[in-house]
Amino acid sequence: MDTSGFLDLDINSGTTTPNIRNSVTTSNDIMSSIFDTIPTKEKKVDAAVESIFGTEAANSPLISSSIPPIPIEASTSTQQQQQQQQQQEEIIPSQPISVTKENTVTTTTTTTATTAVPTTTTTPTSTLINSEPIVVNPLEVNINTKVDDSDSDQDEQIKKENVVHEIFTPIVSIINNNNNNNNNEIDNNNNGNSNENTTTTTTNKDMNNSFSMGVTTASKDEHIISTTTVGTIEQEIHEKQEEPLISPLQSEFNKIFFSTIPLEKKPLEILKMNAFTGALKYSPLRGIAWKLFLGGLDINRVDKWERDITQQRKRYEKLKEEHCFDPRNSNSTYDPLSQNDDSPWNKFFKNLDTQKIIKIDLERTHPDNDFFSNPVIREMMATILFVYSKTNGIISYRQGMHELLAPIIYLYNQEYSSYKKLDENSSSTLVDFIYNIKYLEHDTFAIFERLMKFTSDWYAPAPTQQTNNSNNSNNTNNNNTTTSPSSSSSSSSSSTTTAAATTVSSSTSTSSSSSTITSSSSSTVSPPPPSSSSSPSPPPPPPLGSNSPTVASSSSSSVQDNEEEELSSKCNDVVLKCKYIHSILLKQKDFELYQHLDSLDIEPQIYLLRWIRLLFGREFHFDDVLNIWDALFAYGENLILIDYFCISMLTYIREHLLKSDSIYALKRIYKYPPVEDVYMLIKKALEIKDSNCSIAGMVKTAQPPTTLSSSGSRQIPNNNNNNNNNNNNNNNNNNNNNNSNNNINNNNNNSNNNITTPSTQANTLPFPETSTFESTTSSFQPYSSQLSSANTTPIDPLSNKTTPLISSTSNVSNTPNITSTSTLLSSSSSSSSSTTTPLQSHTPILTHNNNNSHFSPSPSSSSSSLNNSSHVSIPVKSNVKDIFANSKESDLFSLFSTATTPINNNTSSLSISNPTISIGQARTLNKHKSMTLPSSPLISQDSEALKQLKNTQIEFGNQLKEVLPFLEKGKNFLLGNEDELSKSEIDDFIKALEKVKQIQEILSNNNINNNNENKL
């Protein structure tokens, strides 16, 4: 060969197409440089190491052996290579990719050699990535790398291709360029089965022949370096139609009130169930639920809610403008010194006093909660309480009302502030209208006013002395009023406040020949009437001392007196509720605890007043109070669950109470222990309520006997003529229809001349039985209506013991009984002289007269013996302490010690059975307002034993009086050294000191009473 070309290979990282420049040389030079020398074993190892670790391996010539020259003819078509490149690019996953191509695919043809020779390894530089040692033919190839930038046209037509060889098989081949070999080579490259290749290509200008040398890599990993892309891959965006944004409150509201799917229960029942289980505290509809429970909104008129709420808000705005008037901001001029009631300045100054009291209470409202320290919230609460005080003129504002307002405004502010309309472009909905924070104050006032409809009577103030005097004067006028035979008159005891706390009412029906005295012992603790939660409680029974509808009113009565009487009756409601909880419910559910508290003389109103008026706001944590209110409001029926929740609270601490005395019991009740889960108390209260069904059912099914007699009535023997009884029987029975408040039933028995009057049912409220989820509410008769026959001894519903009653038969009665009344009700008629004892000298007396056959107050007392008289004098007081107020201590111990002599019925005398009674039993009778009174006189005042006992009591009292100062000093010393002594020792000393004081006071009072008796 004359000429041959040197292969110049451009191995640059930046380009993939080699630039080849041909140079003229001899064939001997080419053959000698490639095939002359065969390396030895040592040289092969050195060459391999040098090829791996050396940097000049690409430029150093390889030692090769001489082989016969082989004609080389290998070329590729540029057009086919471009088509193959396009097919390779189409294999890439179809994703929207923006690519900036900077490099092109380098493809080479595979040259195949027919000779197999020993191999050695070398590594080309700057062409392979992550490759292992290269297996090459041990031929020394001298490659001169020269680059000529001038041959650009020739460079574009020649491209490299990657050569795929089998691993560990060195092949050096020179083949002719044909289409079949090119297609196979490209397919192998596309399948990823090729490794990195080092390609050398040379062309012969004269013969237009080209050859290539391929070197395979011994690599197990597959690498594709055919293309290099620079750019960003854009992810496909799938546009989804988003649903309109709805707040959780809106979603919950629509789910309950506007559900397209029929619900298993009604919306109100769902809310009530959530309230009892505790799920309501997590609901955003708690405020609406309270308003529904209290009757602020009608659940059956959801479509009218927007109109009703608008009216409530407008009403509050009107009241606020009317009562929150400031004459300083008015354009008109008013006299600030005017005392006229219509004067704006006079109203303004009165309002300032009320507002000052309100603000003082608000400063003490939950001081540990920062929410109530906010000036905006305080101003809002002050305005609400002031507007309510002006709309409720009788009660106005009372301390404790702010405690009821605090949870309401806290809840409403929390819900109104958290609600936010997510989609401002959407139309306004009912939820958007309700939860408008602009009307937070308006809606808070609306629900607070609804709550006060059930609790306002509990805040009625105690009647003043002027009220008592006016009532007494009215009672006097009523007693002196002349009535027809069919009319009725009433009178009260001297103290309205004391009587109101013990009894509900008493009435009498009188005629010219008959008289009736009615009293109800069980009515002292009457339960409230069950009714729907949306209606206010019915009007209370007429107060003591007020005129009944059938009594002729006095000419001096006025509207102001009626308001005072109404206020007095409201004040009694909460006291009666306390007594009902203690004496009825607690006794039924836990008699042991009731008996223990009763023995400690702990009045129920001492602690129950705070529990009831504040709805347990100070006994539990603030969040627990909200949970308790959920259940109270959801149960409805005039918040009757309060009664049973009180019993649940007492039974929760019963073990502490049973082991403690009066001091520790009060401490435990006043400082109620923390409760981990208040729903346990709620569940217990519901169980107590449901367990009353059997008791109430027994009362409901009780049938009245033939002869009317009750534990709350008084049977008094009356020797009237048969003709008079027959004439007045119809008149007395007609009063039952006219007097609806008293329900006086007068049944005159002609055979035995008995006059019996059952307890009034109107004054005794029905016993609650049904639960909230029952469809109808049954009304049950009170305990006082449990009527028994004359032959059966009635059972006292409070003590479950036989109750003594005065009865009269044709024969001598061995068990005449009597129950006391709190007021003396009698007709205005004359009576003959009666006998009394010193015990009865200062008490109202009922005197029985054979001639006139009626009872009247005794004008004076007599010292004659009762056994020698035909009259019976019965002292009537509201409690046992008042009855024995003027008696001596010795009389108390010997009151029932002497047996009585039976009195013949012909002389209108009474025989008292079971005359012996202990002081403990007397205390129990005091609580129950029912006791047995003696018919025998007291021990003679001239007895020597009585004088000695008097002197002993006086001396003992004087000695205790001298000892008390030293005991007080010891108490102060112990309190000053609390660190050295144990708390139990100090408490024991204090208890002993208190008992000594009580004994000294009793002896001192007896000494004063003895002196008063001696003066009389």
Curated annotation (Swiss-Prot):
One MF annotation (Gene Ontology) recorded for this entry: GTPase activator activity
Record Gene3D superfamilies: putative rabgap domain of human tbc1 domain family member 14 like domains, Ypt/Rab-GAP domain of gyp1p, domain 3
A single GO BP: adenylate cyclase-inhibiting G protein-coupled receptor signaling pathway
Claim: Ribosomal protein is one of the keywords in the record: no
Biased composition (Pro residues): 526-544
Stretches the record annotates as Disordered: 1-23, 60-109, 179-209, 463-566, 704-872
Top-level taxon of the source organism: Eukaryota
Compositionally biased residues, Low complexity: 79-88, 467-525, 545-558, 718-755, 766-789, 807-872
Keyword field: GTPase activation
Pfam families membership: RabGAP-TBC
PANTHER family, alphabetized: TBC1 DOMAIN FAMILY MEMBER 5 (PTHR22957:SF337), TBC1 DOMAIN FAMILY MEMBER GTPASE-ACTIVATING PROTEIN (PTHR22957)
Function (record text): May act as a GTPase-activating protein for Rab family protein(s).
Name under which the protein is recorded: TBC1 domain family member 5 homolog B
Species whose genome carries this gene: Dictyostelium discoideum (Social amoeba)
Lineage: Eukaryota, Amoebozoa, Evosea, Eumycetozoa, Dictyostelia
Gene behind the chain: tbc1d5B
